[in-house]
From Swiss-Prot:
Region (Disordered): 460-482
Protein name (database record): Bifunctional protein GlmU
Top enzyme category: transferase
Catalysed reactions listed for this entry: alpha-D-glucosamine 1-phosphate + acetyl-CoA = N-acetyl-alpha-D-glucosamine 1-phosphate + CoA + H(+); N-acetyl-alpha-D-glucosamine 1-phosphate + UTP + H(+) = UDP-N-acetyl-alpha-D-glucosamine + diphosphate
Cofactors: Mg(2+)
């Protein structure tokens, strides 16, 4: 079937979602790096509709602000009172000036597993079959609680959607269910919505009543069956949110593995929809990949690693690390137990080792920061080694300052670099130094007090202590040797 461009997609996002038991509107809850409604908008966007409208109601200021951020082209319609799905769609049409010529697709804002391909198939089936309305359905293993799709035995047309509580025994045996997603003829939809009544137990305008109105008027009501029944699942509570996260995560990891990524343990690996991979990446157990993280060809990440908005280049290794907004260069080595904060850039074959934290710093090719160090607001050249337990003192209590260390430098253990300060190319610094002044290229900087040994201090100040007795024993042994 050829692609059909709908005249409009209406996303229903006005509900409160009380079963989520949250101050956050239901459609704004996060799932694999995107809000529930964000997933729906992404799927709807694949249809390239002429108009994209979201109907908001509960906490509409928050929802509208979020929509403007994630889908700038979306138009919002306000449902002041939640008077049912039919009323919500009517508000959506009014936001577009009333009746719309062409196909109108209606989707729920809490169905994040719905794909663009399924919506395309719905629109194509609707047009090809000449339906007034086409409902997206699915065959499920257990239809308990769902509205059943009743079809005409001869034509296959949908004759009714029967809610579970109203279904007969034979109807309850039906496993084809209503998803709440529809494609309508825009003009017929507008006309039928004007005839929807509120004489029901909820006193609301039901969108499903439109199907009966159109059928009674002699129009055809059809169906398009989703290939995977899990796509139509709505999210109403945290349990369903967790299940949807598992399903979507599995979908994302399966796609990555089929594209040449090794995921050692998919059950403990979690990714966002915005994460990208190249071939021959290896992801170890306990890894979380978020935001715009990108893993380049042949790199290896994990175990127990969390990367957010971080790029790892080809052949790099990142182990037991937390990184946010960092860039790990080709064949670089990070971890274990490293923390890379925003603005950190690591060069070719560089190393950030065990218990090292780096922030807004760059290190050049072959440079190593192997152990127990903090590097903040610094630039380090190529092939330099930073000694263990070094601290780049960047903050004076009011402002941040920059440290520059050149190429081919060797800095001693337990150094402090008090910014702003520069260490020139090829310079050395002695262990235990506090570097407060610039070090010229090729120099050795020693900035520490001289050692002074006070003989007999322990015996005088700590008489009778274990230390004093140990020292006395050594002294007696020495006297005996004499």
């Amino acid at each position: 079937m050829s692609a059909i461009r709908p005249a409009a997609v209406v996303v229903l996002a006005a509900g409160e979602g009380t079963r989520m038991k949250s101050a956050t509107p239901k459609v704004l809850h996060e799932l694999c790096g995107r809000s529930l409604v964000g997933h729906v908008l992404a799927a709807a966007g694949e249809l390239d509709p002429e108009n994209l409208v979201a109907v908001v109601g509960h906490a509409r200021e928050k929802v509208t602000a979020h929509l403007a951020e994630v889908a700038p082209d979306v138009r919002t319609a306000v449902q002041e009172q939640q008077n049912g799905t039919g009323h919500a769609v009517r508000m959506g049409l009014e936001a577009m000036g009333g009746a719309v010529d062409g196909v109108v697709v209606v989707v729920c804002g809490d169905t994040p597993l719905l794909t663009g391909e399924t919506l395309k198939a719905l629109a194509a089936t609707h047009t090809a079959d000449g339906n007034a309305v086409t409902v997206l359905t699915a065959e499920v293993p257990d239809a308990t609680g769902y509205g059943r799709i009743v079809r005409d035995g001869a034509s296959g047309a949908v004759t009714a959607i029967v809610e579970h509580k109203d279904a007969s025994e034979s109807q309850r045996a039906i496993r084809e269910i209503n998803s709440g997603v529809f494609a309508f003829d825009g003009q017929l939809l507008a006309d039928a919505l004007g005839k929807v009544r509120t004489d029901n137990s909820q006193g609301e305008e039901y969108l499903t009543d439109v199907l009966g109105i159109l059928r009674e008027a002699g129009h055809r009501v059809g169906a398009s069956v989703a290939g995977d029944h899990r796509e139509i699942a709505g999210i109403n509570n945290r349990v369903q949110l967790a299940e949807a996260r598992r399903i979507l995560n599995d979908r994302l990891l399966t796609g990555a593995m089929l594209a040449g990524v090794t995921v050692v343990d998919p059950a403990t690996t979690w990714v966002d929809v915005t994460v990208t991979f190249e071939q021959d990446v290896v992801v170890h157990p306990g890894t979380q990949l978020h935001g715009t993280t990108h893993l380049a060809e042949g790199c290896e990440v994990g175990p127990n690693t969390r990367l957010t908005d971080t790029r790892v280049e080809a052949g790099a290794r990142v182990d037991n690390t937390v990184a946010n907004g960092a860039h790990v260069g080709p064949q670089a080595s990070v971890g274990p137990y490293a923390y890379l904060r925003p603005g950190t850039r690591l060069g070719l074959k560089s190393k950030i080792g065990t218990f090292v934290e780096a922030k807004n710093s760059s290190i050049g090719e072959g440079t190593k920061v192997p152990h127990l160090s903090y590097m903040g607001d610094a630039t380090v050249g190529d092939f330099t080694n930073i000694g263990a337990a070094s601290v780049f003192v960047n903050y004076d209590g009011q402002d941040k300052h920059h440290t520059t260390i050149g190429s081919h430098c060797r800095t001693g253990s337990d150094n402090m670099f008090v910014a702003p300060v520069t260490v020139g190319d090829g310079a050395y610094t002695a262990a235990g130094s506090v570097i407060t002044k610039d070090v010229p290229p090729g120099s050795l900087a020693v900035a520490r007090g001289q050692q002074r040994n006070i003989e007999g201090w322990v015996a005088r100040k700590r008489p009778g202590s274990a230390a004093a007795k140990a020292a006395e024993a050594v002294s007696r042994e020495a006297d005996g040797e004499d």
